[in-house]
């Protein structure tokens, strides 16, 4: 539409496929493990204090820069599929990361808009076998989006 390009997105079923191809990782600290063994790279934009519970196969936050630089340096690295997710559907950091990666020349960047909130809600309903995470999270609401109506009321009362 118009002059702006639309953002490529994936849904929870696409993410389940990614999880099925994720393999357990052992002693991979600061290696090119993620850039050489998978056809995709899964990146999250969660704050550093929220890295304990992730979707399996997610690149550790401390390895993101090394992995991205390795892809940039590689001959076909910029065509690698990269999937970005965050806290929830209202998490703007996901779209900022998307723009950053596209600006670096990556061609196949996609966004999982539901983020951890949707994933954990689906896990709660359908189970961890269908919606696995790297650890069990009991407080699903810490991933929920802020209420738009609540912020509107605050503005109206000012």
Residue ranges and their predicted role:
Residues 1-30, 35-40, 45-158:
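Rhodanese-like catalytic fold shared by cysteine-dependent sulfurtransferases
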